[in-house]
Amino acid sequence: MEDQDAAFIKQATEAIVDVSLNIDNIDPIIKELLERVRNRQNRLQNKKPALIPAENGVDINSQGGNIKVKKENALPKPPKSSKSKPQDRRNSTGEKRFKCAKCSLEFSRSSDLRRHEKTHFAILPNICPQCGKGFARKDALKRHYDTLTCRRNRTKLLTAGGEGINELLKKVKQSNIVHRQDNNHNGSSNG
């Protein structure tokens, strides 16, 4: 199989050299193959494969067998700088991307990143007063409140812990209110 691949690559290289010298004497099948290669290269323009230099100004890709004719007058492009800050990532369309430090999620707005980062808190700030389930966002708590899941969780809590659960939930709710007041006070004094 390797001998066939080597023979094919040799024939293709010779055909490309012939193409670069005189386009009129090319087999129509070779012309079609070259058009396909050019179209594929246009689609994959951003991806630059590692090329192995060969004779006659022809480069052959070591992985995919792609063939590329070198232009003698082409100047090498300067290497791109990789000095990008983690917060200043940009996608292919040029818009900024904000990456979460704890997981691999990326967001197009910094506000979305801040909202997402709350999900990584050890103690979630919004606690359901009925079942004790914690939520990172208030809107998620509102959606959850008094749903079948909430009632099921409450039933499980009551059967597992008895009536002492109500007292525990009140303490959690009270400490949550105090925690929010402290955060609001600290945030307003820094502004």
Curated annotation (Swiss-Prot):
Keyword Transport appears in the UniProt entry: no
Subcellular location: Cytoplasm; Nucleus
Positions annotated as zinc finger (C2H2-type): 98-120, 126-150
Region of interest (Disordered), residue spans: 70-96
The keyword DNA-binding is annotated on this UniProt entry: yes
Alphabetized UniProt keyword annotations: Cytoplasm, DNA-binding, Metal-binding, Nucleus, Repeat, Transcription, Transcription regulation, Zinc, Zinc-finger
Segments forming a coiled coil: none
Biased composition (Basic and acidic residues): 85-96
Pfam families in the record: zf-C2H2
Biological processes, Gene Ontology terms: negative regulation of transcription by RNA polymerase II; positive regulation of transcription by RNA polymerase II; regulation of mitotic cell cycle; regulation of sulfur amino acid metabolic process; regulation of sulfur metabolic process; regulation of transcription by RNA polymerase II
Primary localisation category: cytoplasm
Gene Ontology CC terms, in alphabetical order: cytoplasm; nucleus; transcription regulator complex
Cited InterPro entries: Znf_C2H2_sf, Znf_C2H2_type
UniProt GO MF annotations: cis-regulatory region sequence-specific DNA binding; DNA-binding transcription factor activity, RNA polymerase II-specific; RNA polymerase II-specific DNA-binding transcription factor binding; zinc ion binding
Transmembrane segments: none
Gene3D superfamilies linked to this entry: Classic Zinc Finger
SMART domains found in the cross-reference section: ZnF_C2H2 (SM00355)
Protein's job: Auxiliary transcriptional regulator of sulfur amino acid metabolism. Involved in the transcriptional activation of MET28.
Self-association and partners: Interacts with MET4 and MET28.
Name the UniProt record assigns to this protein: Transcriptional regulator MET32
Source species taxonomy: Eukaryota, Fungi, Dikarya, Ascomycota, Saccharomycotina
Recorded name of the encoding gene: MET32
